[in-house]
């Protein structure tokens, strides 16, 4: 049963359960317990599962560890502390693991000194175990295991099949999952949930402690953390003190009219604002949504304000930079040496980066929870305000960010979705279970169903994965995919096959697929990585930006690029990076705002009245409200406002007589991707004609030289048939091929590493396509193929909410209004311009939108 913690304990009550040495250390170090600690420590001490959601600087880590350290101290004081693991701390980041080890050193050494003062020798060990741990360190851990083991989800699953170390896990009483919100919504979390159930089966009940940033609904994350006990929901207390920190958030529109302004004016205003914000604060963290955006901001600030910024006081931080450069950036931040750091997503999670007094979000982060998480990196101490500024870049961005601002200030957060019944991850874990020891088939299924992610796993899907692993698809041997387990149906058991099972498992586990990237070296030092596609475009003498610095390309050998430092104007790299999708919940809030605005115009409200409403409702200033007002007014007068109750379908003829149909379906890119592909498939089947698709968060368009019947094709889609139509639309696409390669790697159909050799991503891709074709012809319901389809439709796209949209239309809750326009309506500008991204520079795209805007103004005046 999941319950919210209502009781806050007194300091005296908490000190009474702490070992005297631990209590003494705490009194010397802190004035008092934080709210999170008052709510959680007593129940962790009692062995209850707890999920803590609290802001940065609220003592979350100590909340989890204090009673554990106290219990270990008591065991050591009584001479009962064994040489084995009592607590496992799991985080998604190796850097966070290293932070935690450093942060634990202070209390453990201080408590050790207090004990020594009483003539007692206290040794509580902690250690980090990740893929970076050396063989020497691993050997030491076997002889002297840490009492607190700090690790990652992937390493935990390896330790579960390591025979000698498994014995050291038999005393585990506590598991802490940090940054649980960043694991719960992806396959790393699914993988971890099964590892926790396997650990529970090995050692018996243990206390589960989850630490989370602001997330909704907390009940779902709590269920993900604790799972089930053979059909019954395990108990968990939710400690929610995410409200504690005061928020200082504002939205900045760089110019008075974001459409009428030319690109140079917008660029100048944008960087002047960024410069002023940085100058007014000690340390500023700027978030962009792409790595290319990160590089561009660093380069522009240094080139526009050379007297203020150099390599010594502003740096970039993103996943394509080398580990050494990322660590250098983090260390300089901690020491207060940087004025500003620009990041894409790599600094969102809670690694220790010292004092940040301002966070700037450059353009929409696409969800309220991500905005709060990023802004929460500022004001590290509990009673300091989290200060954030959202700088917008166009009118769609302005509306989106205004709703993010409103929801953030009002505490309305998007829902988290936890993937379920992932058959590739299941295959990996069944193999791991078989390596541990032979299992009863039914008992193994019961243990698997204890995971929240597999609570509804069908027996049919489970047996199909067993069948694949047992080599019952004998034809796969022709493609070098061999049986990994044996199954005895008479005895109802399965177990491992082969002497290399443990090696194969340990070197191929995990859920993060290998990506194509080339190493960039300057003078023998690795400075970062670039995408393979980008490397192929480089010619000798080309210059590009990496880590905020300019390099000249000399040559490439294999997957290594040789460069030298350069100066002058660079070519900003077009990194391959999936854009962040707009959350469905936020999309609906924007649609509701559109509906309210539509009503205001229909009832003839005055400009002043509507302006007052916008400023009050969205918490924005007059400049932002004016741009929003004009944007909606133009759309209303020209074509009508699409909203939660009305989907506009806009027909117009473009350059050279090309036909366009724009669907104003503001439901986020993931929903629109699903619907648009299904519509395009129906058109192709009906008219034997391929159509061009362009998809955004705000809608999608179809384009063709001739008749398409787009609306007719859309009306053919029903809630009941969308999944089947989309399944057919996805077959033989690069999207499915890519996802199948990832799933086949997780399910160990494609071995990324074998006997010390690593298979390149290129070879994996080729092998994936061969296997996809083979299994499609062998059995259309092959479990890993089914999983690849599920991943595309449910995780990459959002078919569930796409079906909801079709239900609204079927039930009459949303009407479809067809319109014909000479020029695309204002709400369609960005979507239409997006289709020209490959042939238009950014400045030309802005100019294209400005010209369309002027044409609309002229049309309205007629």
From Swiss-Prot:
This is ATP-dependent helicase Lhr-Core. ATP binds at residues 37, 60-61, 178-179, 360, 377, 380. Residues 425-513 are annotated as: WH domain. Gene3D superfamilies: P-loop containing nucleotide triphosphate hydrolases. GO terms for molecular function: ATP binding; ATP hydrolysis activity; catalytic activity, acting on DNA; DNA binding; helicase activity. The record marks 512 as: Wedges between bases of the loading strand. Coiled coil: none annotated. A motif (DEAH box) lies at residues 178-181. SMART domains: AAA, DEXDc, HELICc. Keywords: ATP-binding, DNA damage, DNA repair, DNA-binding, Helicase, Hydrolase, Isomerase, Nucleotide-binding. Residues 514-862 are annotated as: Domain 4. PROSITE patterns: HELICASE_ATP_BIND_1, HELICASE_CTER. It comes from Methanothermobacter thermautotrophicus (strain ATCC 29096 / DSM 1053 / JCM 10044 / NBRC 100330 / Delta H). Belongs to the Lhr helicase family. Lhr-Core subfamily. Residues 41-233 form the Helicase ATP-binding domain. The keyword Lipid metabolism does not apply. Composed of 2 helicase domains, a winged-helix (WH) domain, and Lhr-specific domain 4. Monomer.
